[in-house]
């Protein structure tokens, strides 16, 4: 279990839910008939709550007021299993409270109660002391800045310096226009509007997006520059090139707290040694879960897995496939199927004609790299699996990580194992577990290698 320290502005989110069907006689404003009320952890506490939902151990550091809202807030943190030992009481301010008024599941108003003054020197020292005490114990840090007075320039830079000194990952969710405040952070997560305001640059093209991210890297020394683009996903730099991770969300009901979900899921993904691209895909999936709910919602690992795996109903794990099959004549074949072409489709159609259920074992990306070198595959396993599953002749697709499909064949025990005719007089792996092995002729003139060579020639001309 990863240990993550979250520091930032703590916000109590309060919701009034109801219906509004008339205007007030006192003024031209809607009247809400309240049907229920709810309270959520907001701001940095919502980041912490998201991390708890993703099975992390969380230490939260910030301030609340000396009031009833502050007491309830700390109680709610403890109830969620969040370590609240870093929460300080500021007698000079109220607990930040945002009240959202929801009618027919639409937000019609918000009322904010807050004090944005910077913390006094004593509180700032106590926060930094807590940070210093915990830094060796934790795996990563998130600075959640809502511009409410906790993370001023000096404190932010001191925490980033300490994190770097101890070789800890530190991510910042920025606010304001001065990004030098976050310089030397591992990663920051501005949205498009925030980054445009900070850099005075319109992000209306790939060129400007790339330029903005280069500025973050070269001017502010952000190790992994990134920008969130709402419905267009997340953009980042990889070896100096702009990469876009498209969004996954199908329906958007409420974007409240989506940024908190993104930074929480990015942090955990990177701490689990995911690549930045994979971490962005994971964060997009987590965001897709929460924007499909009302209020500052949470995404569980199970919900994220469902989103990531909802590529095609025919793409199953071996375990799920074995549960599905029922006394039918099973045909099995396997391959890389990189750059799917007519020859592949013809081969699979002929294989399907031999029985009832055609199962295709698909080499994973890692498997292909071992077999064919680092430049392959051209098409990712997720996309290759989706294309195969889209063929009417294919009933199920199972991705395997090994160099050969022997484990799949042994588990499935197919009626017919289909391989290409080029296996004539060669050993067919797994044939001992099939009732029959059938060698199928390929359609002449079609191969992935030929397509790659044609593309190379075209590019060179």
Swiss-Prot record:
Pathways per UniProt: Nucleotide-sugar biosynthesis; ADP-L-glycero-beta-D-manno-heptose biosynthesis; ADP-L-glycero-beta-D-manno-heptose from D-glycero-beta-D-manno-heptose 7-phosphate: step 1/4; Nucleotide-sugar biosynthesis; ADP-L-glycero-beta-D-manno-heptose biosynthesis; ADP-L-glycero-beta-D-manno-heptose from D-glycero-beta-D-manno-heptose 7-phosphate: step 3/4; Bacterial outer membrane biogenesis; LPS core biosynthesis
One GO MF term attached to the UniProt entry: heptose 7-phosphate kinase activity
InterPro entries in the cross-refs: Bifunc_HldE, Cyt_trans-like, PfkB_dom, RfaE_dom_I, RfaE_dom_II, Ribokinase-like, Rossmann-like_a/b/a_fold
GO annotation, biological process: ADP-L-glycero-beta-D-manno-heptose biosynthetic process; lipopolysaccharide core region biosynthetic process
Enzyme Commission designation: 2.7.1.167, 2.7.7.70
Record key words, sorted: ATP-binding, Carbohydrate metabolism, Kinase, Lipopolysaccharide biosynthesis, Multifunctional enzyme, Nucleotide-binding, Nucleotidyltransferase, Transferase
Gene3D superfamilies on file: 3.40.1190.20, HUPs
Region Ribokinase, residue ranges: 1-315
Function: Catalyzes the ADP transfer from ATP to D-glycero-beta-D-manno-heptose 1-phosphate, yielding ADP-D-glycero-beta-D-manno-heptose.
Stored HAMAP family: HldE
PANTHER family in the cross-refs: BIFUNCTIONAL PROTEIN HLDE (PTHR46969:SF1)
NCBIfam families hit by this protein: cyt_tran_rel, rfaE_dom_I, rfaE_dom_II
UniProt subunit comment: Homodimer.
Protein name in the entry: Bifunctional protein HldE
Organism: Helicobacter pylori (strain ATCC 700392 / 26695)
Gene: hldE
